[in-house]
Amino acid sequence: MPSFDIVSEVDLQEARNAVDNASREVESRFDFRNVEASFELNDASKTIKVLSESDFQVNQLLDILRAKLLKRGIEGSSLDVPENIVHSGKTWFVEAKLKQGIESATQKKIVKMIKDSKLKVQAQIQGDEIRVTGKSRDDLQAVMAVVRGGDLGQPFQFKNFRD
């Protein structure tokens, strides 16, 4: 029986490359001359700390970071940015989290979407991923289209496609 897994992962090496590219762009931009602005990627907690001297510059840095992430193949929706920007001393910063794995509420929504599509497939939750099995390849590809079309706030990848 054909099957595949639905996962949500971010390649940390690509994220590191995007952070390095964004740092290089900030160093060369005229509007960030003589300004303390930086990006810090923490591999352990999977967060990116964006630091600058004012709140609007933090927002500009976030836009630069999103563009660089997109160029490296990481969707902007995989970056979870809190609304409030923290002010500490003379710097402003925000810690954006990279979304890894699928939360249980989102998993249930995906399984419900698959069941509501009336396709002849079975979806089962396995840890932080979802295994989908069906009799035909076409049904599985239709499930992929349903999951991509659903607006669930994070990107999904499809792995272990077996025939």
UniProtKB/Swiss-Prot annotation:
SUPFAM superfamilies the UniProt entry points to: YajQ-like
Gene Ontology molecular function, alphabetical: nucleotide binding
Keyword Nucleotide-binding belongs to the record: yes
Record keywords: Nucleotide-binding
Superkingdom assignment: Bacteria
Annotated signal peptide: none
One cellular component (GO) term of this entry: cytosol
Keyword presence, Nucleotide-binding: yes
Classification via InterPro entries: DUF520 (IPR007551), UPF0234-like_C (IPR035571), UPF0234_N (IPR035570), YajQ-like_sf (IPR036183)
Sequence similarity: Belongs to the YajQ family.
Function as written in the Swiss-Prot or TrEMBL entry: Nucleotide-binding protein.
Descriptive protein name: Nucleotide-binding protein YajQ
Species this protein is from: Escherichia coli O127:H6 (strain E2348/69 / EPEC)
